[in-house]
């Protein structure tokens, strides 16, 4: 079976040394970087890049030439690939809650912005980008519709609620999800193929124990195991990094193949 690491939040404000610290010692393990095209310096009330001061409020990732050079070298070596991580990774304060940007956008705006910034990332890193990752893994039905229009894959977990346009594809996976939940106590499906895009389940990496449990469930049902990290958390929490290394070691010993996210859609 395949496993893949999706690491979120690389942006203009990221130093290449931070990515190297998080992943440079993971020899032979590729990492799919979810890159923010034009990042806001803070994410709501979360400050992944510290509290500044910053030289700008919004930063185009391509303006960080040192970072782009580092990532491009990693792409050439098969260490990294680029996924698109929202537009600004911006949050809006609504009724005392922080709402991620992809929950606060309509269809036409989504099509325009996603196409614009996908092209920007592809030109910046000289690579094809096929996968969109929503900040906080949250997006409204207009984003799903836009991604299908554009033909970009994504990662999501099907909800019990009807949270997107009704289609034959969606109903098929919605029913399968609920049957799996009832009979297997595990709602993952694997690759979900819609009209013009595909979707995959993914899991947060919190600790070794919970991740190992999810890995074994994916193995039992012959599904790819894709989990996501944040490089800035790995760098600030030694136990989290230690648990990640332990998980990788155990999965490889178990015969799992380290892969990039885009390889898991195949």
Where are these regions (language model features)?
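C-terminal domain-boundary segment and adjacent tail
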Residues: 154-156, 219-266
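Short, conserved active-site loop motifs that form the nucleotide-linked donor/cofactor pocket
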Residues: 79-80, 256
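CE4/NodB-like, metal-dependent polysaccharide N-deacetylase domain
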Residues: 30, 104-140, 217-228
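Active-site-adjacent pocket scaffolds in enzyme catalytic domains
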Residues: 43-72, 76, 131-225
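A cross-domain feature marking catalytic cores of carbohydrate-active enzymes
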Residues: 7-9, 33-37, 84-86, 133-136, ...
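Short catalytic/ligand-binding loop motif for oxyanion handling, primarily in non-cytosolic enzymes
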Residues: 12-14, 40-44, 90-95, 138-143, ...
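Active-site beta->alpha N-cap acidic-glycine motif
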Residues: 1-77, 123, 128, 227
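Generic structural signal for well-ordered alpha-helices
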Residues: 17-23, 68-72, 111-118, 144, ...
């Amino acid at each position: 079976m395949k496993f893949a690491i999706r690491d979120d939040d690389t942006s203009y404000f990221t130093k290449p040394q931070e990515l190297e610290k998080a992943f440079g010692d993971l020899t032979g393990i590729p990492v799919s970087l979810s890159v923010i095209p034009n990042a806001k310096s803070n994410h709501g009330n979360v400050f992944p890049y510290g509290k500044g001061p910053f030289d700008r409020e919004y930063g185009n990732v391509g303006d960080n030439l040192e970072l782009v050079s580092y990532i491009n070298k990693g792409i050439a070596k098969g260490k990294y690939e680029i996924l698109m991580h929202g537009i600004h990774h911006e949050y809006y304060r609504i009724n005392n809650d922080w709402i991620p940007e992809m929950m606060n956008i309509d269809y036409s705006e989504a099509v325009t912005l996603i196409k614009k910034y996908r092209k920007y990332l592809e030109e910046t890193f000289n690579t094809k980008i096929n996968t969109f990752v929503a900040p906080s893994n949250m997006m409204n039905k207009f984003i799903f519709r836009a991604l299908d229009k554009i033909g970009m894959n994504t990662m999501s977990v099907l909800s019990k609620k009807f949270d997107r346009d009704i289609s034959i594809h969606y109903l098929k996976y919605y029913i399968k999800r609920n049957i799996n939940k009832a009979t297997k106590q595990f709602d993952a499906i694997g690759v979900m193929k819609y009209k013009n895009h595909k979707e995959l389940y993914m899991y947060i990496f919190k600790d070794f124990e919970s991740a190992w449990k999810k890995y074994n469930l994916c193995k039992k049902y012959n599904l790819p195991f894709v989990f996501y990290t944040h490089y800035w958390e790995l760098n600030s929490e030694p136990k989290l990094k230690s648990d990640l290394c332990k998980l990788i070691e155990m999965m490889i010993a178990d015969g799992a193949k380290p892969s990039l996210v885009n390889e898991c859609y195949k």
